Amino acid sequence: QRDTGWVQYYGESSQEVLDTIIQSYILAEALDIPVMVVLDAFYQSHTSENIWVPDAELVDEFLPPKALKGNEIDPNDPKDFGGLVPPEHYGKFNTDYWADINKVEDLSEKIAKRFEKQFGRKYSNVEAVNIGKQTKIVLVTLSSITTTARGVIKKYPDVGLLKLRLFKTFPRK
């Protein structure tokens, strides 16, 4: 997945997945980079849980208006969209891509803070739980296994948890 070019988020719960999808629109539009929100295929898709679906008006307030950038599909003016870049353009394409992908971590946190103000649920790229001087083991998790790990660290005070929500780009902070 390193070179696919997609930003990757992993959701611990169905609520987090829905909330992250809403936040992802801003990130994808701001940077012109596709975003995937990953849901555990078996554990989350084969269970049910209550989620709060926000009113469309609240989501519309949160999301910026769609900005037309000149790359919209128009049958009267066909264009080629895809991942193939000829060698003479690849250097600039790759430089531009990495300049944008390096903005993901900070922009993701800013979007999450705005989301918390609007909807009252807090998310961050990385969540550290019970990590301190007493910690001997740290469980690093993605997705729904995090919920199981939360139960483990309650029983074992020397075990901490590091939950990754943002995986690509891998958080550096």
Task: Give the residues covered by each predicted segment.
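Short, low-complexity, polar/charged sequence segments that are solvent-exposed and flexible
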Residues: 26-30, 55-58, 157-158
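Short acidic, glycine/serine/threonine-rich loops at helix termini
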Residues: 19-22, 46-53, 150-151
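Gly/Ser/Thr-rich loops at beta-strand to alpha-helix junctions
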Residues: 14-15, 42-44, 142-148
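Conformationally flexible catalytic loops at phosphate/diphosphate-handling active centers
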Residues: 35-127
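A generic short-segment signal for beta-strand/edge and adjacent turn/coil regions
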Residues: 3-8, 104-111, 157
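Conserved thiamine diphosphate
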Residues: 1-41, 65-66
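Thiamine diphosphate
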Residues: 3, 113-173
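Catalytic cores of large soluble enzymes that bind and process phosphate-bearing ligands
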Residues: 9-19, 96-107, 141
